Amino acid sequence: MISHGKDIKIFTGNANPALAQEICKLIGIKLGEAEVKSFADGEASVSLYESVRGSDVFLINSTCKPVNDSLMELLIMIDACKRASAGRVTAVIPYFGYARQDRKAKSRDPISAKLVANMLTASGADRVLTMDLHASHIQGFFDIPVDNLLGNPVFVDYYAKKFGEKCENMAVVSPDVGSVARARTFAQKLHMSLAIVDKRRQKANQCEVMNVIGDVAGKDCILFDDMIDTAGSICNAAKAIVEVGGANSVYACASHGVLSGPALERLSSSVIKEVALLNTIPETMGAGCDKIKYLSVAPMFAEAIERIYQEISIAKLFN
């Protein structure tokens, strides 16, 4: 690593320490010494066991389950670093929770993503580094720099090696209209055709698949989305691709494996052959489902952190 006069320090909370360790190993530094624990009543407590004065500090903590605990850990870590005279604090949030609450869907709804942005800024964060925000316009909720890395290259590399020349006879399928832009870019990179599943959502976390737009008959398909929560949408989409569209087989991939409630059971019993997830959320969340394969985003975050530290553009990571 090239130094430019100030130390780099990386700390992690309890949300995804394995990813933080992997990032530090790639950069070639030790993970900072800190303790993030809870008092008997559940309050988060942070202790930094090394100086951060004047340092370029990166705090790694996905705001995943337990979501509110993970968020409070991050906020308190930021505050601790600022009060200890850190030169700059970057909140590294591989999975940004509350991103689905980015607008008022009905009367009197909160815009929780904006609230979280305000909280991160108020706590003292100087910039945010994240990946595949559920809604990219959330970057505009902040008054500080936000770098939203894309997981697309990781999946493109994986499937290009997995399927090789077969890619030209495969299809990428968006599970809904909202994911079409992501799926289109993914399909173009792999030289695959594009299809869309049209669905009608009945209530939260449930949906009814209606139709498949595009030709998937006889093809091996990849369902592409930004996250899998309860897995209802992805499993119903896969079923429609096979039963309605006549696809030969279905694979699935998503940047964030939230995997709540019945997700693992649904994926295990679905027609999906394999589910590729990024490790923005701990791999332990997928334990118990043999179909799940995790791909590491540590190299991408490590390079982004090094570039931010060295004051070099990270535009390369978006191309």
Task: Please tell me what each predicted stretch does.
Residues 1-319:
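PRPP-associated nucleotide enzymes
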